[in-house]
């Protein structure tokens, strides 16, 4: 009887040990979504969405490319999967295991802006006539302010740096102005909007909102 009890006890200990061993080996996996704000040769800087827990650790993460990732474009939204803890230096660093490009959000905004331009009155060059002709689509863009601002402002900056300023850029500037009411300015062109907004962001203004903070990250 004692021998049987001893054997049962050993079996329990072995099973418990195996269970603990299995638990210890379980990977500590996390993920978050954010926006690319800087592209480098072997890494990129990503700003987590404010709704993500990681944002409480840092507003910037240095993400090393993995699995041959080569689609870094400022303004794109990505999902980052990582293992272990956050190294809270600045920018924060993590052990990245996977990078996924969330292109649907960007494509939706791009398609709607292009639709406004393509369906506008042929005889008019007035941006407000184009918006009036596709008011429903324009309002849909305003209904998703964060997505729209991220794409529109990123594209504005890229166009500005390439000395480009067209009807699409003007509509993007209008969207940014309507979404971010923290900066109010009656601009004459998309380039004019970008230049004056950059001046505003360089001031010591104490009440920058989330759109201003995102814009400052893009401009760094």
Where are these regions (language model features)?
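Extended repeat-based scaffolds of very large eukaryotic assembly and lipid-transport proteins
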Residues: 104-220
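Beta-strand/loop nucleic-acid-binding surfaces
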Residues: 54-71
